[in-house]
Amino acid sequence: MLHDIGKGYSAHHEAIGSKIAVKVAKRLGLSESVQNCIGFLILNHFLLPLTSERRDIHDPATIKSVAGMVKDARRLKLLFIVSICDSMAVSKTRFNSWRKMLLTELFDRTLSYLKNTEEYFKSDMYYIENATETAKNLKGKRGYNFLKGIKDLNGFITGFVNQFYSPGKYLTRESSENILLHLKLFSKITPGHRFNFVAKPHIGEDYYEIIICGEDKKTMFSDITGTLSYFDFNIMSADINTRKDGRFIDTFFVNHIYKKVDGDIDWHKLRNTFFNVFNGNISLEDMLKNKRKSESLYKKSGPRVSNSVEIYNNISGEFTVIEIQALDRKGLLYDIGRIFNVFDINIFASKITTQGNKAFDTFYVKNDQGGKIRNPLYIRKIKQAVINEI
């Protein structure tokens, strides 16, 4: 009831609202510990929703940061309840199954961290052993014939995982089932068949998990996001995995703008378009330009959006984090990806959030040397180039 009491006083109403709520609690005769708890909950009632939507919740630094703010499991549970109630009250359509899933996963991960910090950071071998057990169960089953002749499954999976530039990151993000699915997709890559993809429907949550693998190239992110945008997919999140053997496997979490997950989507046409775009047979830029032109005839104007680009090196221990706020439009990620290509920026994860006509895009990136982007002049040039494009 008190969480939005500060609205109307300032843009960041949670800070002043927290102070007002503490005064109210004091007048009601509540104990000092309850007063402090109420103040904390109101001050931080955006923490879990914004973190789950705009930060990489598989990055240990994210979980450590949230845990450091909430301090204990009881406060985390109370904050989770406030977050759920507030999100549901704002809008039933805004608090969809995807956002609920992200919020719940952030809560679960942070709770596990608070309960047993040492156990939370499991070794790579723990995940590989789980994947090995899954491989044993799948061996000989339809679609997994490539496992038949492999005697040392543990060594085989370890070798596969170690080809990623960030094997630890890959293992903590992917389930054992997905790791085996990736191996299956890679087993079908040949010189004449340079990419493979599969779309996994999540009907209850109303989104697709589109997994794409193949021979890596500089424009891969912009090629994929541009093609998905052309086919009217809304990209909500992406995990980007590049490998030392020149291959990639990327996962895009998407929903369709016009169709439900159980709707009729022409996957064959999407596959053919991917093939032609990857091989340079068609111009994705021209395709998007024509589609934007036709859609602009029917698009209604909305509120103005202030474009902004912020670049941080203190959010993640491993990555530079780039936050972009812009007017949402078809092909926005494609345009951002092209700018990143110019500056040799490699994307490892992205979180995409939209509120009305406003897009909040967060990218976890490295430079072409595999490190953070730290040069102040280079950072200014990146910011200006992105602002000019969006």
Give the predicted meaning of each segment.
Residues S65-I390:
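Regulatory modules associated with amino-acid/nitrogen control
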